Amino acid sequence: RQGRVSTLPPGVEVLRCWRNQLLTLSSETNCLTLYDAHDYPLVTLPAGIRPCGCAVVDCQVIVCGCEDGCLHIFSLPDLREIAVYPVPGCPMRVAADGGVLTCLSLLSPDPPQTLLFRLCLTSGDFAPVALLPGWCGAVTIADDHTIWAGVGEQLLHFPLDSVVPDVQLGEFGLIRFLSCQQSKLLISDPWAGRCLLMDTTPPYAPCQLYAGECGGCCFASCRKGTLPDWKASLNEP
């Protein structure tokens, strides 16, 4: 498979693929940019103040505006802003599950406190889940619609419709990205310089995939019902 190297604008916080195009969010330029298949910028639009998180769902992208205190919804591919939702604090991370957004928002920097909440795009209803000590790390939604969140030095799991975590794991740096697929949780922990893979069922034992300087990682595309043989790949030289 042919590789691809792209030149990106400064301060890129998030990279996302949409069809065969690349979407970037920069906290330095405060802009969301869509590139074509040849890395030519097609559209660039302002998106918040020091934005640092986004999620792509079908033909929409949800951006955490961070210091402007809003979640912004843009249509794809024209990046037209179609909705703005003011929320408490500085929204920094977001994950989408159908028409419901799950977000992490920094309420206080000293000491750091993070609000985990859900927002229904259809009704606009806001539902706080938990107020947690520590900085915003990452959030993702599992296949069973439950929440995995990294806040401070902890990784937490919230069952469906619960405001109390049933799993609390420590000894992380500050998790930057989480990705859940087929009962596997991929954990990017750049402060600790590692990427981990963990089953979403007990005994919750993270397996280190990579150690070193690491900005993030994600699952590659694969056929439904299949995942790479992680154990075999870890044994390769």
Task: Set out the residue ranges of the language-model regions.
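Inter-blade boundary loops/turns of WD-repeat beta-propellers
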Residues: 27, 37, 76, 119-121, ...
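Short loop/turn segments that connect beta-strands within the blades of beta-propeller domains
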Residues: 1, 18-19, 27-28, 57-58, ...
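Repeated scaffold domains used in trafficking and secretory/extracellular systems
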Residues: 10-18, 49-57, 89-97, 133-142, ...
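Structural motif
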Residues: 30-33, 70-73, 110-117, 154-158, ...
